[in-house]
Curated annotation (Swiss-Prot):
Positions of modified residues (Phosphoserine): S4
Main subcellular localisation: nucleus
Pfam family, one: Yae1_N
Cellular compartments annotated: Nucleus
Gene Ontology cellular-component terms listed: nucleus
Protein name: Protein LTO1 homolog
Subunit details: Forms a complex with YAE1. Interacts with PYCR1 and PYCR2.
Signal peptide: none
Length: 137
């Protein structure tokens, strides 16, 4: 009778065993897919931020060259804001996605960029699309 009891236990416990095995397999597969999806999302988001910062940097360096020889007081104010923008861009932590003030610093750069554009009296339109990213005026 003890042998038949073991057979019934195996049958009764099969549901629990299969449930546990299914959970483990599903968890492992879900973890693997989650890592891949997270990496894809992080890469895309990081590329967008990098493209935006790079665009600001190129814009700032171009205007630095253009304003370098100007000596009016108005241009002096533009140069101060421009130097501040360039400094913020250069201090931005490109290689540390865990930096706790990353988005705060990015917002400050965006604000300084808007301030500089206002001084220049230009209306930038930053776009990220499948064809690439860039500024238009």
């Amino acid at each position: 009778m003890a042998g038949s009891q073991d057979i019934f236990d195996a049958i009764v416990m099969a549901d629990e065993r299969f449930h546990g095995e299914g959970y483990r397999e599903g968890y492992e597969e879900g973890s693997s897919l989650g890592v891949m999806e997270g990496r894809q999302h992080g890469t895309l988001h990081g590329a967008k931020i990098g493209s935006e910062i790079g665009c600001y940097q190129g814009f700032a360096f171009a205007w630095k060259c253009l304003l370098h020889s100007c000596t009016t007081e108005k241009d002096s104010r533009k140069m101060k804001v421009l130097e501040s923008l360039i400094g913020m861009i250069q201090k931005f932590p490109y290689d540390d996605p865990t930096y706790d003030k990353l988005h705060e610093d990015l917002d400050k750069i965006r604000g300084k960029f808007k301030q500089f554009c206002s001084l220049l009296n230009v209306q930038p339109d930053f776009k990220i699309s499948a064809e690439g990213s860039g500024l238009s005026f």
